[in-house]
Amino acid sequence: ADVSTAKIADLVVIKDGSEADGSTANTLRARVTDAFGNALAGQTVSVMAGNGATVAPTVITEPDGTVEISVTSQTAGISAVTASINSSSQSRDVTFIADVRTAKIAELEVIRDNAVADGSTANTLQVKVTDANGNTLAGQAVSVLAGNSATVASTVTTKPDGTVEISVTSQTAGTSTVTASINSSSLSRNVTFVADVSTAKIADLVVIQDNSVADGAMANTLRMRVTDAFGNTLGGQTVSVTADNSAMVASTVITGPDGTVEISVTSQTAGISIVTASINNSSLSRDVTFVADVRTAKIADLVVIKDGSEADGSTANTLQVRVTDAFGNALAGQTVSVLADNGATVAPTVTTQPDGTVEISVTSQTAGVSAVTATINSSTQSQNVTFIADVRTAKIADLVVIKDGSEADGSTANTLQVKVTDAFGNALAGQTVSVMAGNGATTAPTVTTQPDGTVEISVTSQTAGASTVTASINNSSLSQNVTFVADVSTAKIADLVVIKDGSEADGS
């Protein structure tokens, strides 16, 4: 055979589709002949391979003019193998495939983050699977897990470029760790879900301080929590707040990073205030209670509700005292000191009822005005009540002769003064006293007492001597004697009578 005309007669692929692992070879067979087709042994053939494949630079033909060419690569894809001798060459393509046995997670990238934690809006990652030499692997099943209660397909399958997107949803705001695994290879990335402000609602409204003093400064406190529809806390949310019963509160508050904010409520009005927190169409209400400020207890009112009682020591005049704080809130359970003058009797202290009032009963055996004073702290008020003498017990207290020894001329009078009092010695005016006089004396049958309980009784007589004058009222009476004397200014010889006659004329 003519070596001078050596040429590549054939280049045939005899093994193809090997793994691109750098050791498993694709194989070709080259045949060298002369110009007339005669096989040429011992010919050196130059070999090249494209796309990063590895091949011996020369091979030598066997006695039959053929030689096998082994080509390896770490790069999946087509490699063009060219065999040349003299000016003759031929090329054939061989294909290396990625090595599924060494499949690994080459990349895991977050391509969309901070999705809303609404259970439907997804964060997205892209995973890339390659073999040990970085060749992309299609059709590979990748296992996926997501933490913090996020939802994800348990497996995804790579596309022709070795990648696949992973969609992750959650109803839980916060960080979710997403892990992609194949064989013993895994990578993890964090994605973040944010609470859904479009569904913001008042999740909780809790009273954390209650029963503050209604002084306009001391606050009752509530803690409010705002979440989305799935219970994720929402920071930075503006919440509207109202409070009734004249309580004062900021009209809006803004939630902290944990979704909570404290609401301070003050009032000058004791009682219950309903506090309402609202966002979007969501609202919650809670009651807080303000209590009257005992430190500023004062006598707000002292009113006479019953007056003019009898001074009998048992029938009472009544007053009502009302105790409030500095802002007019009624104070229950407060001890009020009470004094009454002019001999009246009263409990030294009384205790206010739930409405801040208490009645004060005052009795007396002394008719007249009694000043009643109620005191708490440094606050006092006074009112007058009047006790009247008890006509039911009217009696003749005194009957005194103030003029005596008048002439028994039927016109010149002896005079007495009668005094009428009740059982406790209180003078009784306007009382009708019955009068009688003995020994033919003349007097008015009744007299009426003056404002001081006294009245004068005039008695005349034409009969000299003692006359017993009796004054009576109810079952009480007193008597005094007055004396009438004969009227010398009218002396006359009333009689001249011989009482002894015929005596001896003996001068003795």
Question: Which positions does each model-derived feature cover?
Answer:
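Thr-biased low-complexity repeat/linker tracts and other Thr-enriched repetitive architectures
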Residues: A1-S508
